[in-house]
């Protein structure tokens, strides 16, 4: 640790000038070697010993991360590096590779400017490699490539130097294929990786060595030399000594990752919504430490001693202890109590943190991931702040959680709330009437690890078997449906119809929201969403969570503005619990076509109008060919070629479909789609049994799909039974009134 302590003060000095800073992340498919690579960088920085690098997992500071050997949360570290006489302060973010934790990856990408994408040379480019690279490109983060586990090609697969070179060239080609597919035109060509310009390195994180073209030329090393060294020494100790991996990686970073000033000049265009205020926009684009304070929050963590620790990037201005700030999303004024930089699990206090740095802040107790923090003095100039962080996964698996001791219930709810604050892909629903607590996550492992956190708090509870989250939608357009309020003095007429894919995509991607002015909103919906002009002009409410619209198509209705908020709340209630099975509604347009509102406010309050709206929408949806949508995973199985038949057979048995098979030397990759419902419970055991444990697979959320008719009624009744609802499917007529 001595060597490390010496550079702390110097690092802090370097961080005062953004030109010295490089903000980077290491991203990859699960088990391709990110954390082992990070440990090598820590070793070079003097944080851990060389011998421990590769096995210490220093950035995995969760106990369960150490046990499972996977990274769950994103941890931060700052490194000192010198190249050609120039000094760098390199802020490194380690991110998870397991698909269930991509929410943490997405948030990490917001604060970094370059990403080292790690690819296992045996497995090559996999489903998660594609996911994280696409996410990086969407956030305008420059990708670099490290091809890992070359030792396995030599020792296990016994490939010749020529075969290894062919494999590396194929990985580079496939990786550049991702940049071609997902990169923006202005970055596509210049961000493609090339061996010639040192934007690609290969090596072995486990054995601590790495090579770029320049290092190979400088040290006169050829492929055949590496093979010879492994033949003499299976641990490749000479390679660790002569070509340490940290030099290859940090050389790549120093050469190709932009400093925050350069990066923000093109990233802020994509990340910042409010472009009208030129002074703010320019301060952000220029990464101006003297500009107004603007910070983007990417993570919230609960520290057992310090409480809520907010991590984010200072895009403009300087963070100072004691300063009053305003949280744009939470609409709250708060005071910064302490400012620090991260060193793995430790925070090193810095009284001032200028633009371009990643900071840890105490005092922002109302912040959540995606929050925009600004100096209190400029709060009225910021309309909506940073673009919403878009997550590629959705919470599609749910469990019911019940405290064994009723006295523990408040503590259980509080602990789960804190977890959801830290993890945006985790959703808790507490039914006040029944006392039931539901926890939704992206997969079984995600929920298992989240509940492990709760057990660590000393709470005992029972957990149900995992079930799938469904969505309700409609396939047709209803006739106009009338519903009266309970006192019969108010009338609501509505229709229901499906939204087109373009509009759903606009809502999902955050390109339309209620914070936009009505003229801009209508223009985007009409031009990009191909929406009817009158509908686009009259959107009352956007359900950003489930992608639905409430549209006012009434003409000349008296007192409508006075009850608008009540009608809106009724709409949002139904969108959370649809008519078929009380599941969230997705992709539906509800049009209010007429209304009769009583003149006396006492007769038109929420107790009268909310049930009327709910009843009308239920009737309309049930008469518009209602459907249940089920979540579908994309599945990718890595298997020996002789087991392809078994893998295809199992996927087919589970209502899945295979869409492609790719040969990669001695392994084959089977790609397909499979309903999430079919992967719960025994799927892992069945796959292991049919392939004798020789197949490896990963799933990621892909899309929603209507349940087959043969299954829909059965599943709807199952859900209704589980929720204690009436065990028969509702009929539209039950919710329709007549004049």
Swiss-Prot record:
One of its GO terms (biological process) is translational elongation. Residues 19-261 form the tr-type G domain. The modification Diphthamide is found at residue 603. It comes from the Archaea. GO terms for molecular function: GTP binding; GTPase activity; translation elongation factor activity. It is found in: Cytoplasm. One of its GO terms (cellular component) is ribonucleoprotein complex. This is Elongation factor 2. It comes from Korarchaeum cryptofilum (strain OPF8).
């Amino acid at each position: 640790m001595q060597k490390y302590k010496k550079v702390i003060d110097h690092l802090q000095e370097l961080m005062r000038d953004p030109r010295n800073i490089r903000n980077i992340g290491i991203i990859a498919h699960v088990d391709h070697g990110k954390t082992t690579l990070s440990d090598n960088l820590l070793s070079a920085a003097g944080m851990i010993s060389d011998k421990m690098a590769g096995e210490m997992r220093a950035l995995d500071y969760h106990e369960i991360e150490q046990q499972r050997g996977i990274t769950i949360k994103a941890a931060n570290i700052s490194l000192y590096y010198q190249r050609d006489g120039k000094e760098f302060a390199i802020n490194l973010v380690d991110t998870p590779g397991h698909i269930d934790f991509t929410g943490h990856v997405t948030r990490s990408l917001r604060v970094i400017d370059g990403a080292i994408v790690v690819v296992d040379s045996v497995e090559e480019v996999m489903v998660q490699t594609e996911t994280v690279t696409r996410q990086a490109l969407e956030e305008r983060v420059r990708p670099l490539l490290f091809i890992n586990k070359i030792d396995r090609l030599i020792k296990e697969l016994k490939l010749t130097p020529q075969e290894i070179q062919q494999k590396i060239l194929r990985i580079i080609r496939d990786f550049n294929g991702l940049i071609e597919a997902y990169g923006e035109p202005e970055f596509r060509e210049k961000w493609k990786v090339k061996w010639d310009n040192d934007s690609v390195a290969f090596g072995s994180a486990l054995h601590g060595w790495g090579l770029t073209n320049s290092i190979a030329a400088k040290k006169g090393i050829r492929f055949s030399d590496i093979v010879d060294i492994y033949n003499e020494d299976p641990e490749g100790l000479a390679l660790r000594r002569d070509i340490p991996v940290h030099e290859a990686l940090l050389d790549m970073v120093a050469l190709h990752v932009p400093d925050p000033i350069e990066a923000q000049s093109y990233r802020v265009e994509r990340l910042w919504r409010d472009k009208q205020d030129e002074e703010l926009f320019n301060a952000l684009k220029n990464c101006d430490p003297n500009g107004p304070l603007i910070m983007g929050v990417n993570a919230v963590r609960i520290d057992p001693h310090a409480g809520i620790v907010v991590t984010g990037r200072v895009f403009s201005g300087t963070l100072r202890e004691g300063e009053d700030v305003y949280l744009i999303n939470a609409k709250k004024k708060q005071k910064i109590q302490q400012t620090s930089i991260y060193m793995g699990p430790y925070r090193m206090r810095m009284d001032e943190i200028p633009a371009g740095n990643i900071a840890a802040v105490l005092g922002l107790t109302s912040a959540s991931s995606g929050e925009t923090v600004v100096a209190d003095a400029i709060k009225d100039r910021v309309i909506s702040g940073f673009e919403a962080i878009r997550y590629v996964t959705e919470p599609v698996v749910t469990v019911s959680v019940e405290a064994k001791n009723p006295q523990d219930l408040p503590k259980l709810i509080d602990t789960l709330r804190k977890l959801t604050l830290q993890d945006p892909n985790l959703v808790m629903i507490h039914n006040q009437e029944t006392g039931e607590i539901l926890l939704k996550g992206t997969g079984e492992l995600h929920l298992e690890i989240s509940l492990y956190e709760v057990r660590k708090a000393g709470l005992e509870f029972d957990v149900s078997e995992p079930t799938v989250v469904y969505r309700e939608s409609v396939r047709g357009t209803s006739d106009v449906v009338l519903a009266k309020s309970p006192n019969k003095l108010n009338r609501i007429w509505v229709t229901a119809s499906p939204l087109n894919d373009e509009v759903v995509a606009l809502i999902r991607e955050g390109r339309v929201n209620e914070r936009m002015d009505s003229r801009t909103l209508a223009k985007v919906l009409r031009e990009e969403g191909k929406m009817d002009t009158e509908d686009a002009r009259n959107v009352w409410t956007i359900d950003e969570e489930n992608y639905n619209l409430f549209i006012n198509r009434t003409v000349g209705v008296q007192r409508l503005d006075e009850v608008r908020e009540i009608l809106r709340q009724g709409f949002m209630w139904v969108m959370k619990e649809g008519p078929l099975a009380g599941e969230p509604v997705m992709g539906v347009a509800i049009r209010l076509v007429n209304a009769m509102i009583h003149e006396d406010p006492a007769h038109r309050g929420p107790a009268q109008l909310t049930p009327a709206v709910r009843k009308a929408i239920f009737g309309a949806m049930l008469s518009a060919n209602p459907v249940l949508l089920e979540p579908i995973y994309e599945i990718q199985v890595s298997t020996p070629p002789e087991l392809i038949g078994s893998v295809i057979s199992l996927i087919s048995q589970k209502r899945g479909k295979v869409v492609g098979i790719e040969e990669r030397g001695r392994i084959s990759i089977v790609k397909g789609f499979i309903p999430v419902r079919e992967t719960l419970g025994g799927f892992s055991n069945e796959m292991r049994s049919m392939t004798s444990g020789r197949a490896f697979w990963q799933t990621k959320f892909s899309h929603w799909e209507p349940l087959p008719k043969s299954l829909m009624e059965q599943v709807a009744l199952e859900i209704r039974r589980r929720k204690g609802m009436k065990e028969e499917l509702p009929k539209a007529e039950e919710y329709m009134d007549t004049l």
